[in-house]
Regions:
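Catalytic P-loop NTPase motifs of RecA-like helicase/translocase cores
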Residues: 129-130, 144, 159-160
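A short beta-strand-to-loop transition that corresponds to the Sensor-1 phosphate-sensing loop
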Residues: 124-125, 152-157
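Clamp-loader machinery-focused feature within the broader ASCE/P-loop NTPase space
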Residues: 2-132
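Short regulatory helix/loop adjacent to the ATP-binding pocket of P-loop NTPases
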Residues: 136-141, 157-164
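Short glycine-enriched loop/turn motifs at secondary-structure junctions
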Residues: 1-2, 164
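Short, surface-exposed helix-loop/turn micro-motifs enriched in polar/charged residues
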Residues: 57-60, 148, 152, 160
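Conserved catalytic/switch belt of AAA+ P-loop NTPases
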Residues: 110, 135-152
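Short, structurally constrained coil/turn elements
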Residues: 73-75, 144, 164
Length: 164
């Protein structure tokens, strides 16, 4: 994936994240919500690359380190992107993210990072987690491992379970 910069209307949130990381008070979970097409996924990619980068700056990921090279090759071992599955036979995409998918993601998040940095998991759209899947995620959201970032993307934040 290309390492991208953030859009101008995302600068205020970006600066909050930069300050949090500098103070070592980075939250472990984020909900990025907004209308479809405003750049949530673009912003999420920038944040993910920056968190995984071994030499991050206030402007973003360096683009040069091993972690950035793996990011650009779309093969970073400490990054997972979770979305509804597509049936191989029918080609139809499920309307929900299933509990088995979340359990696999939680297993990934409970392991140590392979590059000794962050582990980043993105769930898009988080509002299609079924109840069992959302409940499977709760303990990890409440008590994540060190250097873990979970990013939930949604166009419909009110559709998320209240506990999330």
């Amino acid at each position: 994936m290309k390492i991208s910069s953030v859009f101008p209307w995302q600068q205020a949130v970006w600066q909050l994240l930069v300050q949090s990381r500098a103070r070592q008070t980075m939250p472990h979970a984020f909900i990025f919500s907004g209308l479809s097409g405003v750049g949530k996924l673009h912003f999420t990619h920038a944040v993910s690359a920056w968190l995984l980068c071994q030499q991050p700056t206030a402007l973003g990921a360096c683009g040069q380190c091993k972690s950035c090279q793996l990011w650009q090759a779309e093969s970073h071992p400490d990054y997972r992107f979770l979305q509804a599955m597509t049936d191989e036979k029918t080609g139809k995409t499920s309307r929900i993210i299933k509990v088995d998918q979340v359990r696999e993601l939680v297993g990934f998040l409970n392991k140590s990072a392979q590059l000794n940095g962050y582990r980043v998991a993105v769930i898009q759209p988080a509002d299609i987690l079924n109840i069992n899947a959302a409940n499977s995620l709760l303990k990890t959201l409440e008590e994540p491992g060190a250097n873990t970032a979970i990013i939930l993307l949604t166009d419909q934040p009110l559709a998320l379970l209240p506990t999330i």
